[in-house]
Regions:
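Hydrophobic/aromatic-rich effector regions of fungal transcription factors
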Residues: 154, 158-165
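Proline-centered turn/helix-capping motifs that create local helix->coil transitions or kinks
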Residues: 83-89, 187-201, 265-269, 308-313, ...
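Acidic/polar, glycine-enriched structural segments that form the non-catalytic walls/loops
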Residues: 1-103, 169-171, 182-185, 238-239, ...
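Active-site core of glycosidic bond-cleaving carbohydrate-active enzymes
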Residues: 102-139, 152, 177-180, 184, ...
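The feature captures the catalytic groove of carbohydrate-active enzymes
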Residues: 9-43, 143-150, 187-255, 286
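Non-catalytic C-terminal accessory modules of carbohydrate-active enzymes
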Residues: 359-509
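Acidic/His metal-coordination segments adjacent to aromatic residues that form catalytic metal sites
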Residues: 94, 133-145, 202-220, 382-396
Length: 510
């Protein structure tokens, strides 16, 4: 039988099909090339599309893990990012999403570009940075979202980290005018915040947009966190290339940090066990719980690295996040007060990792993965299972590729992480990746010291593991640290060396 149409509402047309319909192909086309197609043509298209994507030169195999599902999500994350990529003016531009997030967001782009650089695609990431820099305003600042002062600090971080990951100090020197200008912007913003010396934000940042669960223009801390992190990155960059500005910028950072600590002490609120937490808003609203908007705090922990591991404020805010979990992720920190911001899991996991809790970071990785779709993609935010009473309550694009980048970043950093002049290996290795014959590998993954390769193989009887690490050649790398968790049995670890490759025979708890 034939199908018929039924109007079911304004701007809506429903197709009603006969009961005996077994197969259906839907083909949407427009323009002079549109035409009728057959069912056999439609059946062939999924295979042709899949084959096309398989033939692309994408960095699959750079990160290899023994959990098949996690590997599929990793590969999907790489593919998601490339499927949303566009070529503009001859340059590859990585888009955050395909529809409502198809555009330039500085913080999203920062971590997408970092993830791709990890995977050996530094040239493509650099093109994305060049595109980003075209959005610098006439006054030298970045203000794409409006009073989103943190964009300036984020760009400083991007420039510094990209130079480290690619080992290209000449590129950093070529961008030094931009670095110098952005440090000046941060100084200028701090001065503007002092117009009213009695204002809570005086000496920090003017009132601005928090994002990540908190709207409006407020005296708040997300812009403070990221501009502290950006200024710290500028200081480290100046030291790296021995720029004359290093001492002046370090003094500015010290003053900024001291002003922040004084304000944080004023605004901290009592929590459990004597802890003092810091809400994002300097004048908290009763309608906004302290857990809301804590994304930039997590970024300040890592990659910002502005807090020492034993900092009481950092420990208190982490306890706040720990106490607000649902399905293994932080609950109510984003735009949905009753929802889960899926890839906030990476921010949260990275903060735990940096503060020395690798096993918790590994747990968070799996909770993050458990919120992916069957095809390995994420919404930005969603309600916990069974709590979407209205139906269709979600936030963000689909797929949301910042999430894909964060999954790549978290897997990479659980396996290899830079700590100053040290390279730490297996600090957040999931225990479930250590079954008999399991293999975990990194292949020429970019680090601050150059590419690193790693191969961990568990023996057939599960009683030992062999680790091979090909160490980067940078003279800045002073120490290679291998983390042996509860999975390693007490006993002597046998070590040897073949050129730049270090070998470890590790006895395991069976």
């Amino acid at each position: 039988g034939a199908w018929r149409t039924s109007k079911t509402g304004k701007n809506r047309l429903t197709l009603v099909f006969p009961d005996d319909l077994a197969e259906l192909a839907v083909y949407c086309a427009s323009g002079h090339e549109a035409g009728e197609v057959g069912l056999e043509w439609a059946k062939a298209q999924p295979g042709l599309s899949a084959g096309w994507w398989r033939r692309r030169d994408f960095p699959y195999g750079t990160l290899s893990v023994p959990d098949r599902t996690m590997q599929e999500i990793l590969d999907s994350s790489i593919r998601n990012i490339y499927q949303a990529r566009e070529i503009k003016n001859g340059l590859p531009i990585f888009q955050v999403g395909p529809t409502c997030y198809r555009g330039l967001w500085v913080v999203d782009g920062c971590f997408i570009l970092e993830a791709m650089t990890y995977l050996g695609r530094g040239a493509e990431a650099r093109a994305g940075i060049d595109h980003l820099l075209t959005r610098q305003g006439p006054d030298g600042s970045f203000d794409i979202l409006g009073k989103y002062w943190k964009e300036n600090g984020i760009v400083l971080y991007i420039l510094y980290r990209h130079a480290l990951l690619t080992g290209d100090m000449e590129w950093l020197k070529a961008k030094w005018g931009t670095v110098r200008t952005l440090v000046g912007v941060i100084k200028r913003l701090r001065e503007a915040s002092r117009k009213n010396p009695a204002a809570p934000e005086a000496g920090l940042m003017p009132p601005g947009f928090s994002d990540g669960g908190i709207g409006g223009i407020n005296a708040e801390y997300t812009n403070v966190y990221w501009n502290l992190a950006g200024l710290r990155a500028a200081v480290e960059a100046a030291r790296l290339i021995q720029a004359p500005e290093a001492a002046d910028w370090e003094a500015e950072y010290s003053d900024f940090w001291a002003t922040f600590r004084k304000a944080a002490k004023r605004d901290a609120k009592p929590y459990r066990d004597g802890l003092m937490i810091l809400p994002v808003l300097m004048a908290p609203s009763p309608d906004i719980l302290p857990v809301r908007g804590q994304w930039a705090f997590c970024h300040a922990v890592f990659p910002g690295q502005i807090f020492e591991p034993d900092d009481p404020l950092a420990r208190a805010n982490m306890a706040l996040l720990d106490d607000n979990q649902s399905e293994g992720l932080v609950y109510g920190t984003g735009w949905m007060a009753n929802g889960i911001w899926n890839y906030f899991g990476s921010f949260y996991g990275h903060a735990h990792l940096w503060l020395g809790n690798g096993p918790k970071a590994a747990e968070v990785l799996y909770a993050f993965a458990n919120h992916a779709s069957p095809l390995g993609a994420w919404r930005e935010e969603q309600p916990p299972a069974g709590q979407d009473k209205k139906g269709g309550t979600f936030v963000g694009d689909m797929p949301h590729n910042w999430a894909s980048a964060e999954f790549i970043r978290l897997v990479r950093n659980l396996l290899v992480l830079e700590r100053g002049q040290e390279l730490h290996v297996l600090e957040g290795l999931p225990r479930s990746w250590l079954f008999a014959n399991a293999e975990t590998a990194l292949k020429d993954v970019a680090t601050d010291f150059g590419p690193v390769s790693l191969h961990l193989k568990v023996s057939a009887d599960g009683r030992s593991a062999t680790l091979a690490v090909t160490k980067p050649e940078s003279p800045r790398l002073k120490k290679l640290v291998v983390h042996l968790g509860a999975w390693a049995r007490e006993g002597k670890v046998l070590t040897s060396r073949e050129g730049r490759t270090y070998l470890f025979e590790i006895p395991m708890v069976k």
